[in-house]
Amino acid sequence: MYEFDYHKATSVDDALKSLTGATDGKLLAGGMTLLPTMKQRLASPDVLVDLAGIDGMKGIRKEGDQIVVGAMTTHAEVNLSALVQKEIPALAELAGLIGDPQVRNRGTIGGSVANADPSADYPAALVGLNATVTTCLLYTSPSPRDQRGSRMPSSA
C-alpha cells in the first residue's frame, strides 16, 4: 500500500469534516471491497475515514411500520436479527448467504449498497422490498436546493 491519512470518525459530521480538502477521500465501512482494492492499487485515497466509530449508523430497530437498518450493520447482524427474521425473512436469509463467516461478520449493508457489490445483492432486495434508502451528501454546494441528506425509494 501507500501513504494516506486515516481518521476514525465519531459522528457523521466528523466524517464529513475529515473529508474536507481530500482529493480522493474514501469512506471505510466493513472494508471487504475497499481494502483489497487499495492493496491492488486500484484505489489510492489520500484520506481514509473509518465509519466504525459512529454508533448511530449501527443497529436494527422498528419505527412505526418500518424496519430501519443502519448502514454500519453487518451482514451477520441482519441475518441473526429476530426482528428482521420475523418482519423480512427474505432479507435475513439473503444476509446469511453472503460470502463466508468472515465477510458476514465484517461486511456491512451500507458498504454493499454504496458499492453496488454484486456478491451482496442488497440493491435488488431493496427494490423488491420497496425500501427507502437514506443517504448523506458528502460535498458542499452553493445551491440552496441541496440538502444535508436525502431519502429516496430504492426503485427510483
Ranges and model annotations:
Residues 1-141, 145:
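C-terminal structural segment of proteins
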Residues 144-146, 150-156:
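Positively charged, low-complexity/disordered segments
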